[in-house]
Structures are given as C-alpha cells and as structure tokens.
Regions:
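STAS-typified acidic loop motif
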Residues: 2-41, 60
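A short, structure-level motif marking secondary-structure boundaries and short turns
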Residues: 27-29, 79-80, 123
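Short, solvent-exposed coil/turn elements at secondary-structure transition points
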Residues: 30, 91, 113-115
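Amphipathic alpha-helical interaction surfaces in cytosolic regulatory modules
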Residues: 33-107
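Short acidic-hydrophobic, aromatic-tinged amphipathic segments that line or gate anion-handling sites
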Residues: 106-116
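A short, charged, amphipathic alpha-helix used as a generic interaction element across diverse proteins
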Residues: 116, 120-124
Length: 125
C-alpha cells in the first residue's frame, strides 16, 4: 500500500509491504516536522498489526530532520520485546546523522534493504 503525505513544500511517499510477519515501510522524499507526524501515524497503524520485524527503509529519503530521528526512537520504544526494528540508512542524509547523535548505538542499521531482509529469520520474512 502506498501513502503520499504533502504538507506545504514538503512531500513524503511511504509504501507498506508485508513479507509474512515482517513489514517494510519504504520512504521517499522529505521527513521533516511537516511530514513526520503522518509517517508516525502510519507506523502506529502498522504496529497495531503486530509485526515481528519492522524495517524502515530510508534509502530514497532526501532530507531527514531530527523529528524523523525522534520517530525512530519512539518506534523502537513502542515495539514489543519480541519484535525487532531495522533501519535502512546509508550516506550523509540518513546514516551519518543517526551516527552523530548516537542512535546507531541502539538501533539496528543496515545499508541496504537486502541486508535488512537478511537479518529476518526465514520463517518470518
């Protein structure tokens, strides 16, 4: 399922794709204070479906503001203990900020979606 969030000059497109009990939320565009609340609502809806693994793919994200980082922390905190969050982030727009603020210490980061899917147990992905 694809969701498009447009708030003023900011635009974000998120797709939700399920692989058994694993969900991939792929984001393309700007994650800022205008679009992050919409992305947060999508994440909350997805968490209500009780996935065992949540992969947030930021590969095509062109801007990733601090509110996006806060959303990742909130998502990590909302997950049940037996669920896993994997963030796909690579490069100066996404991965570097996560490393600079120390979030890479407790978030599972992968450089590609394929790498993230390799972390999913076969029965779940």
């Amino acid at each position: 399922m694809t969701y498009q969030f447009v708030s003023g000059p900011s635009s974000l497109v998120c797709t939700e794709t399920w692989h058994a009990t694993t969900v991939v939320i792929s984001c393309s565009g700007v994650v800022d204070m205008l679009t992050a609340p919409h992305m947060g609502q999508l994440v909350t809806t997805v968490l209500g479906k009780r996935p065992s693994v949540v992969i947030i793919d930021l590969t095509d994200t062109s801007m990733f503001a601090s509110c996006g980082m806060s959303l990742l922390v909130e998502t990590h905190e909302k997950l049940p203990e037996d669920a896993k969050l994997i963030v796909v982030a690579d490069g100066p727009v996404t991965r570097r900020p996560l490393e600079l603020v120390g979030l890479s210490a407790f978030l599972t980061l992968r450089s590609t979606l394929d790498e993230a899917l390799e972390d999913v147990p076969l029965a779940e992905g």
